A protein has these predicted regions:
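Membrane-embedded alpha-helical hairpins and interfacial helices in multi-pass inner-membrane proteins
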Residues: 32-40, 80-81, 103-207
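Alpha-helical transmembrane segments and their helix-entry boundary regions
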Residues: 50, 61-65, 79-83, 108, ...
Length: 207
């Protein structure tokens, strides 16, 4: 009887984990789709990752970041290479949540800068390597040309700075709505997540 009850709890916990991961991946996909429809020079594909990092902790948010890039890789194979960046952003988001950086303004801006350093600078270096020591083309590269002219920077420095600036705008655009969504979640739902074995931080953290 006890074994059956344990099995049911495990099954329920895994279903809950699957649900929160699917929600996060879905939000990331919707953000990416919205960005494409609006024609913005951003990404908007981290709302789900950040929301899940605050609500569900490290395991589900890393899973969300990884599978979001894996799914995007179906249409854009290069997206899979950025999975490591998404995982780093997810881990950083969990730390920022634990330190209550995400939930307070203007402290939230520090989190945005951290995410942009990971997504913009590290992501920029990864782009440079993937494209054979080239940053490719597009809005960010055009911005880099203007930065190079204005500040007399070399090709790599101007492009990395452009990547960082664009990513600051992107991470601000996804951090604000993800925090607002988190604040709207019922306390009972958050308590349910925090009672699961995959929620590694057991100490109650409040919002």
């Amino acid at each position: 009887m006890a074994r059956k009850a344990h099995s049911e709890r495990t099954k329920s916990s895994l279903l809950l984990l699957l649900s929160i991961v699917m929600l996060g991946v879905g939000l990331n996909f919707l953000g990416r789709l919205l960005n494409l429809l609006l024609g913005l020079p951003l990404y908007l594909d981290n709302v789900g990752t950040l929301l899940v990092s605050m609500a569900g902790g490290l395991v589900p948010c890393i899973t969300v970041g990884f599978f979001s890039n894996l799914i995007n890789g179906v249409n854009d194979p290069n997206s899979t290479y950025y999975a490591v960046i998404s995982i780093l952003i997810a881990a950083a988001a969990v730390i920022c949540k634990k330190k209550r950086v995400l939930q307070r303004f203007p402290a939230m801006l520090l989190a945005v800068l951290i995410f942009a350093l990971l997504g913009g600078l590290l992501g920029g270096v990864l782009t440079w390597l993937i494209n054979g020591k080239s940053f490719g083309e597009g809005y960010t590269v055009d911005l880099a040309v203007k930065i190079a002219d204005a500040l007399s920077l070399d090709y790599i420095s101007s492009n990395l700075l452009a990547c960082f600036l664009v990513d600051v705008a992107d991470k601000l655009a996804v951090t604000v709505p993800s925090v607002l969504l988190f604040l709207l979640l019922p306390k009972k739902l958050l308590d349910l997540f925090r009672a699961q074995s995959w929620y590694l931080q057991k100490k109650y953290e409040g919002r």
